UniProtKB/Swiss-Prot annotation:
Cysteine disulfide links: none
Gene name of the record: MAG1
Native organism: Saccharomyces cerevisiae (strain ATCC 204508 / S288c)
One annotated GO molecular function: DNA-7-methylguanine glycosylase activity
InterPro entries from the UniProt entry: Alkylbase_DNA_Glycosylase/TA (IPR051912), Alkylbase_DNA_glycsylse_CS (IPR000035), DNA_glycosylase (IPR011257), HhH-GPD_domain (IPR003265)
The protein's name in its UniProt record: DNA-3-methyladenine glycosylase
UniProt-listed Gene3D superfamilies: 1.10.1670.40, Hypothetical protein, domain 2
E.C. number(s) listed in UniProt: 3.2.2.21
GO term, biological process aspect, one: base-excision repair, AP site formation
């Protein structure tokens, strides 16, 4: 607890220095506009309050654009079928552009008369070679056919367990383990993204995500004291999976990112959105990517 308080104090101290540099003698205002608050759901507003209390310098990132995932107007009850379609979309979009993924999904929808097939229908259709051939013609590789069938089997055979699993709270690791163990093509990263966009879990953090790594590099670039403290207090080193890549920004190891993110717990999912925005150099492209993430 003592160490966490020290990190919190360093984050806030570095933030105050940065704000003072930019604002000079102008007063600091970190209260989100009432209209902004009214449009977002309560748990997101609570997250913003917590994050700004920890680091006021993040105010502009939060204020400048709405967060589609947390808008009241986008909140609808999700069914087991909705979860299946979201995970199926994740599989379809792997290793290809968003536009290509949308095109493939649209062809699947067209094949099934205007709606994405539910898991029970796909479970039966994967037993029929002729139907499998029709699905594959929509643009699915052999590997993605295997992945999609695996997902349909998982939902069909374990739907009662899944309903219970997805309906519980504070079981993020259990959800990740179940998806990764039972569904071919769903790894830890995909499972974490589903926790955020599908189950709306608020305390997820994925240091292995390239955008998060880039945003974190920018975030820490003006916090020298915090960086020194994080480096000094390392106990267990968890190497970044993207460490070997050549980028023009510094890549931090996973343990450094995770330790820093703990300051913003239990709202690290929102902190991830902030880091994604910090990583972007094109606001319009960033907002479009967020919208696609919410829909996928």
């Amino acid at each position: 607890m003592k160490l966490k308080r020290e990190y919190d104090e360093l984050i806030k101290a570095d933030a105050v220095k940065e704000i003072a540099k930019e604002l000079g003698s102008r007063p600091l205002e970190v209260a989100l506009p009432e209209k902004y608050i009214a449009r977002h759901e309560e748990k997101f507003n609570m997250a913003c309050e917590h994050i700004l209390e920890k680091d006021p310098s993040l105010f502009p990132i939060l204020k400048n654009n709405e967060f589609t995932l947390y808008l009241k107007e986008t909140q609808v009850p999700n069914t087991l079928e909705d979860y299946f379609i979201r995970l199926a979309s994740t599989i379809l979009s792997q290793q290809i552009s968003g536009q290509a993924a949308e095109s493939i999904k649209a062809r699947v929808v067209s094949l099934y008369g205007g709606a994405f097939p539910d898991y029970k229908i796909l479970f039966e259709d994967f037993k029929d070679p002729a139907k499998c051939a029709e699905i594959a013609k929509c643009g699915l590789s052999k590997r993605k056919m295997i992945y999609l069938e695996s997902l349909a089997v998982y939902f069909t055979e374990k739907y009662k367990d899944i309903e219970k699993l997805f309906g519980q709270k504070d079981n993020d690791e259990e959800v990740i383990e179940s998806l990764v163990t039972n569904v071919k093509g769903i790894g830890p990263w995909s499972a974490k993204m589903f926790l955020i966009s599908g189950l709306k879990r608020m305390d997820v953090f994925a240091p292995e995500d390239l955008g998060i790594a880039r945003g974190f590099s920018k975030y820490l670039s003006d916090k020298p004291e915090l960086e020194k403290e994080l480096m000094r207090e390392r106990k267990v080193v968890k190497k970044s999976k993207i460490k070997h890549k050549k980028y023009n920004w510094k890549i931090y190891d996973d343990d450094i990112m995770e330790k820093c993110s703990e300051t913003f717990s239990p709202y690290r999912s929102v902190f991830m959105f902030i880091l994604w925005r910090l990583a972007s150099t094109n606001t319009d492209a960033m907002m479009k990517a967020e919208e696609n993430f919410v829909k996928s």
